[in-house]
Amino acid sequence: MTENNKSKLGVLIPGMGSVASTFICGVIACNRGLSKPIGSMTQMGSIRLGKRTENRNPLIKDFVPTVDMNDLVFTGWDINQENVYDIALKSKVLKNDLLEELKPHLQKINVLKGVFDKKYVRRLNGNWVKSGENKLDLAKQVMADIESFNESSGVDSNVMIWCGSTEVYMEPSEIHLSLDAFEEGLKSNHEDIAPSMIYAYAALKMGIPFANGAPNLTVDIPALQELANKTNTPIP
């Protein structure tokens, strides 16, 4: 058996919509004893040790040094200015009575201005979006957001999980083939660099693991894989 990791983990979420708000509500509800983490491998899954007949099946969270759910700290970005309570209420995924119990906690989670390009999500409009000189500037703004969050929250490390809308399908282009080309593309505002790639670049540049929760191209390009290798950062 092993002791739980006692550090605080920041969960950075680009795209604070139905998926993200439901995830956050679920974690907080579990932490307050209002629900159970059904479906969570780390929290409810077990691992078999030795032979089947030995009946040694500890929970994964007791065997691997995972961060306790109470030590998860959330922040994120979106293209509309709402707090997580308002987003969850509008999404109509969870029951209102549960949301009312969680309301004080959810309202504290403010949403940061998002990186937005209508070319990649044509049916959406944003009123809470970043502006900058170029896409490199937008990436630097995301990194500044993360640094500010680190200071205010006291987290020890972070992960980033893309929960935004699925972007339009695209094939890799020359700008995606190397890190040098990609960074030049950021400076020149190249149209083939999607918002999800800007977030991923910012995360990987800071050594923050990036998980893609949508079938976007994002980190499935040589440029960002090169950056991940350079900073020794996972891209699961």
Locations of regions flagged by a protein language model:
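A glycine-rich helix N-cap at a beta->alpha junction
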Residues: 232-236
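Metallocofactor- and cofactor-centric catalytic cores in central/energy metabolism, strongly enriched
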Residues: 1-214, 218-230
